[in-house]
Amino acid sequence: MSDHFPDVSKIEFEGPGSDNPLAFRHYNPDELVAGKSMKDHLRFGAAYWHCMRNPLGDPFGAGTAHMPWDDGSESLDNALARVPVFFEFLEKSQID
């Protein structure tokens, strides 16, 4: 796995008492609900453009999102550079 988010480990369930901002407090992927795991009930997804290309601009100004993996071009090299970053994001977020 690449290391584009070195200060972020895989996000885990820590329970409602956790003060970790990067922890699941109520979502426990392995907990059974009505005979089925939460992971199977709640199939999370991530939209590629919103995660990897959205500069967070609005009608009041240009975007402020800092994405060091993106050089701002529409080149194939730039597109290919984003792929491992997105997969790392998915893995650390536990999105299958």
Give the ranges of each region predicted by the language model.
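N-terminal pre-domain/capping segments
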Residues: M1-D96
